[in-house]
Amino acid sequence: MQIQMLLPLVQTLAQQVADQEHLDLVSVQWLTHQSPPILRVEVRHPENDTSLEDCERLSRALEMALDELPEFEFAYVLEVSSPGLSDYLSSDRDFDAFRGFPVRVTTTAPHRGKTLWEGNLIRRDEVNVYLNQRGRSLAIPRSLIASVQLYTPSSEP
């Protein structure tokens, strides 16, 4: 069985272990260009900064669970870490945490004639991302959005 085909199984197991350890699972990926292959798992604490102890706890529990699976009869390296702070927003948690912060939205196609929008993040729902631009609300369809990134506005003299 190819290692990449095990990814759904690993994601499910990692989610169960993360839930037991009261952590949020951020991502699971195989780095198969390494020998042995690396299983990289990123987690974050839902309320506090993610500690080394959080990562160690999850690593031990996940390693024990993986060792029980007959599909894991091969050598691999398990890496568990925190994703750190990215300046790109992607999850609901990111959008909630950075409400009111200045963001730069890039679209894949023009929206109202532009592909780059800046403003303070109001919120995101199922359909749109909302920005405050000088006191006016702007809705940008999520279907057009390529990225939403935190940025520091330059001060104008």
UniProtKB/Swiss-Prot annotation:
- What this protein is called in its record is Ribosome maturation factor RimP
> What's the source species' lineage?
Bacteria, Bacillati, Cyanobacteriota, Cyanophyceae, Acaryochloridales
Keyword match Mitochondrion: no
Here the disulfide bonds are none
GO biological processes = ribosomal small subunit assembly; translation
Q: Which gene is the coding source of this polypeptide chain? A: rimP
Domain of life assignment: Bacteria
Q: Which organism is it from?
A: Thermosynechococcus vestitus (strain NIES-2133 / IAM M-273 / BP-1)
Annotated localization: Cytoplasm
* Its job: Required for maturation of 30S ribosomal subunits.
